[in-house]
Design a protein with these regions (language model features):
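Short Gly/Ser/Thr- and Asp/Glu-enriched loop/turn motifs at secondary-structure junctions
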Residues: 36-40
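Short amphipathic alpha-helices in soluble, non-transmembrane regions
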Residues: 19-23, 55-63
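Short glycine-/aliphatic-rich beta-strand segments at the starts of folded cytosolic domains
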Residues: 1-11
């Protein structure tokens, strides 16, 4: 499994749950969660393969910033 970590500006738990649902619809075999306690509002995705550009696109299309943490 690969793990990719993203920095976001998602601050509301309810919205993070909606975004997780959208991401799970696109990536059904992935484990996806937000760490809302972290200052970078971390989005963590674990899967066999990950398409960071698609994840970023989904968050951006919902009005949120998202970038891969390096």
């Amino acid at each position: 499994m690969i793990v990719e970590v993203f920095k976001t500006n998602v601050v509301e738990v309810e919205l993070s749950e909606l975004l997780i649902q959208q991401l799970e619809d696109q990536f059904p075999d992935s484990l996806i969660n937000f760490d809302m306690e972290d200052c970078d509002k971390i989005l963590r995705v674990e899967a066999a393969t990950i398409a960071p550009e698609k994840i970023i696109q989904i968050l951006n299309s919902n009005g949120y910033s998202c970038e891969v943490l390096t």
